[in-house]
Amino acid sequence: MDKEKIVIQGARAHNLKNIDVEIPRDKLVVMTGLSGSGKSSLAFDTIYAEGQRRYVESLSAYARQFLGQMDKPDVDLIEGLSPAISIDQKTTSRNPRSTVGTVTEIHDYLRLLYARVGHPVCPNHGIEITSQTIEQMVDRVLEYPEKTRIQIMAPIVSGKKGTHKKTIEEIKKEGYVRIRVDGEIYDINDEIEIEKNKKHSIEIIIDRIVIKEGINTRLYDSIEAALRLADGYAVVDIMGDKELLFSEHYACPYCGFSVGELEPRMFSFNSPFGACPTCDGLGTKLEVDVDTVIPDRSMSLNEGAIIPWRPISSQYYPQMLASACKEFGIDMDTPLEKLSKEELDIILNGSKDKEFYFEYKNDFGMTRETWIPFEGILPNIERRYRETNSDFTRDQMAQYMTDLPCPSCKGYRLKEETLSVKVNDHHIGQISEFSINEALAFFDGLELSEKETQIAAPIFKEVRARLGFLKNVGLDYLTMSRAAGTLSGGEAQRIRLATQIGSRLTGVLYILDEPSIGLHQRDNDRLISTLQSMRDIGNTLIVVEHDEDTMMAADYLIDIGPGAGEHGGRIVAAGTPEEVANNKNSITGDYLSGKKFIPVPAKRRKGNGLELEIIGAKANNLKNVNAKIPLATFSCVTGVSGSGKSSLVNEVLRKALARKLNRNHAKPGEHKEIKGIENLEKIINIDQSPIGRTPRSNPATYTGAFDDIRDLFASTNEAKVRGYKKGRFSFNVKGGRCEACKGDGIIKIEMHFLPDVYVPCEVCHGKRYNGETLDIRYKGKNIAEVLEMTVEEGLEYFTNQPRIARKLQTIVDVGLGYIRLGQPATTLSGGEAQRVKLASELHKRSNGKSFYILDEPTTGLHADDIGRLLKVLQRLVEENGDTVLVIEHNLDVIKQADYLIDLGPEGGDGGGQIIATGTPEKIARSKKSYTGKYLKPILERDKERTEERIATAKKK
C-alpha cells in the first residue's frame, strides 16, 4: 500500500459517478467545483464518514450505541486513511452557556490562573482579603529593616456604635494596659469618653517592638495573642508607615465579607460553585419588553395598541381590559402616549390589590362574573411564559420578551464572591470582556510577584498560544465572553480550527468546509498560513473551498464537475493549481487562468432618486452610524470581519423594516430612526437556512409549482371521472398518499448500536402514493414520476403550462436546473436553498417597492455560480426596480454593485464607523479603506479583460 497517498476507488455517494481518486498525504489539498457538483459528497460523506466509521468500529458494541453512528459510505475501497476530524459550519454549539472562552478552553486556563494567583478584594471596603499562617505574618513583618518600630494590636471593635464600657472592662481584666480608640492611644485606666451614637473602632495594644535580630519568638507570641483576642485578626502598625491587617480567615475584617478557598470551579459560570444565583450563570434575565408589547404608542387601546391582547382568537383578555378601563376611568380611545403616567402604570403593571367587577362572555354565549384585581399586561405575559405547559404559548409569549443583563452580576455570569477575586485589579469577568487583541496586551503587561510568575508561567504559555491562534485566523475582534450561538458559521469554524491548532496533533486528516467564509481579503493570508502550519507539522488537510487565493496556495487541487447534480460527480481535473488552470476541461481552470471572469458593469445605476436613511445606529459596536441606501440599486455593505456589517443590516435595518412592513415583533438594534420606509412595501430576507426542516419540503412545494401541478392532475379526465380533487395528489394528507409509509416513501428501522436503516416502503416502493393515485397520468407520466424529474426535464414536460413553466424557468435561471422537483429540502446545500428562495421571488410580480437583504450569498458558490447569482440579483433591480442590499466580502460581487458602504476601519471596538461610501471606483480610491485597497487591482484587471473581450468580439 502506498503510504504517501489516500486512495479512493468506486465512490458513489449521492451524485458521485463511481469515481477513483488519489489524494497526496501531508499536503494542503483543495477540492473545488460548482455548487452541488459533489465536493461535500466526496470530502465529508465518503472520506470523513469512512475515517470516523473505522475509528468507531474499533470500539465495543456497548460503547458504539452511545456514539452517533456514521453510515458506511457507498465506496469500493479507501486506503491510507488517518483518523479524521471534520471542521464544518453546521456543528456550532447553540448552548447559551458556550462562549468563545469556553469553546477555545481559554476560560479553563483563566479559572486556573485566578485560583492560583488571584487576590480576593472586599467589594465594600476595597481591601485585600487574605488568609495567612502566623509564620507568614511574622515573615511579612520581618521584611522591614532593622530598628523599625512596630506595635501589634488586636482589633476587637470595628465600626460599631455604643460606649463599649463592658468591652473595655474585660480588656482591663485581661491585664492589658493600652488601647487605641478611633486612632487615639489611651491608658486603660484613663477616663475614656466614647460617644454612644457614633461608630467606633477599638484595638488592644498587645506589644511594642523594635525590629532586630532574635525577636522572632516574641513577635510570634504577640501576633498569636492578637489573633486569639480578635477572632483571627491582627493589626501590625508600622510606625511612620502603614498598618498591616492580617487574617486567618478569607473574610473582610470590617464587614465580614468572606471568600472560600480559591478553586478553579469557583470561577466557572457552569458550576453551582461559581454561577450567579440570580441568572444561573447565563448573564441575562428574560424580561418582558414594553416596546415589543406596545410598538406604536400613538395608537389607542381600542385600535389594538397592545399586540399580545389583540382580539384574534379569544375575547377573554380584550374583555378583561375593557372592564378594567371602565373601573379605573381609562379612556380606551385615547392614544397611549396621551394617557397619564398612573393610567399607563395600571395597564402595564396592574392594579395591585384593588379589585374590579369582570363579566366574561365566551364564544358559546355563556357568561361568568367575578371580582378580581387587574393583573397587568407585563406580569400577565411573564406568568404565562413561566407557567404554561404548551410550547405554542411559550413561543408566543417569548416574542414579547428580551434578554437583559442580570441585575446581580451585571452580565458577568458569576457570583459576587468570585468577582471579588482580582489579578492586576481585574476580575475574571472583566478579562472575558476583552477582545483577543486586548487580552494579549493585558497578559503581556501583567505584573506579578516572582513566586506568582513561576506559578502562572505554564498557564500564560497556553493562554497566549490560543489567543495567538485566534488572531491568526482573523478573529482578533471577538471577545471571550461572546456567546457561541451568536457566531456566524465561518467564525465558529475558524474558532474550532484555532482550537485544533492548539492541540498540535499530528498525523491527522482534517476536512474543512470553506474556512474563508466571512473573512475579508485582508485576513485571508493569515488563514492560509495557519492551514499551511497545520500541514507542516504532519497533517493532511482537505479543504472544500472556492476562494481563489486558497486554491492557488494549495499543494494539490481537485476540480469536481463538470456541472452540478446529475451533471457533476466526476473528477474534471487534479494536480497543482497551475496544472488545473491550464486544463481545458475545467471551468475552475478557466477562472484561475482568466479565460473566464465576471465582468465589471459598463455603468452604475443612480437609483430612482429615493433613499432609505439609517440615523444614529448604535447596536453592538456601531458608533452612532448614519447611512444612506439609494433605492432601486444593487448595494453592498463591506468591511473587515467584525466591523459591524451584520449589526447595521441585520440587527438594525432588517428588524426595523420587518417590524414596520411585516408586523414582526423582533426588536431592532439601537438606532434613532429610519427615514424613507414609506417608499417600500415589503422586505424579503433571503438567507441560507433550509427551505424546510423535513424531507416533505422540496423545491416544487416551496416555489408553489407543486400546487399548480396538482391542479393540473386533478383537471385530467380520469381524475374528474373518479372525483379526485387536488388534495388527492398531496403526500401530506390522507387520501392519495401511501398510508404504509405516510407519504414518506421510506421506512426507518432503528438498529440501536448500528446506524438506523432506511428502506424503501414495500407497499409503494418509494413512490409515496397509492396505486389509485398513480393511475392518473398527464402526458404519459404519473405524479410520482413528475417529482422524480429534474427541473430541466420538468420545464420541457410542462412547456405548454405557462404558470408551471414560469416557476420552473426561474429555478433554471438561478442555476438549479439539475435538482429534482421532489428532492427533499434536507438534502439541499445552503447555497442551493438560498437560490430556491430567490427563484420563488423571481416569478412573483413586483411593483418596485420590495427590499431584498442577502447576508453573504456567495457562501458555497463557485465563481461560475456567483456569475449566475449576480445576473439574477441585477435582474431584480433592472426589471422590477426593486432594491437589493448584500453583505459581502467577495470582490466579484463588490465590483458589480452600484453603491458600496464600507465599514471599519478594524473589527470589534476598532470598527463600527463608515469609512467610505459610493461607487466601487470611489471606494477603490479611498486611502482609509481596506476593501478599496484589495478592490482596486481587481477593478483594473477586469476592466482590461472586459475591454479586450469587446475588442476581440468586434474583430470577429
From Swiss-Prot:
ATP binds at residues 33-40, 639-646. Forms a heterotetramer with UvrB during the search for lesions. This is UvrABC system protein A. One of its GO terms (cellular component) is excinuclease repair complex. Disulfide bonds: none annotated. It comes from the Bacteria. The UvrABC repair system catalyzes the recognition and processing of DNA lesions. UvrA is an ATPase and a DNA-binding protein. A damage recognition complex composed of 2 UvrA and 2 UvrB subunits scans DNA for abnormalities. When the presence of a lesion has been verified by UvrB, the UvrA molecules dissociate. A zinc finger (C4-type) spans 252-279, 738-764. It comes from Listeria monocytogenes serovar 1/2a (strain ATCC BAA-679 / EGD-e). Keywords: ATP-binding, Cytoplasm, DNA damage, DNA excision, DNA repair, DNA-binding, Excision nuclease, Metal-binding, Nucleotide-binding, Repeat, SOS response, Zinc, Zinc-finger. Belongs to the ABC transporter superfamily. UvrA family. Pfam families: UvrA_DNA-bind, UvrA_inter.
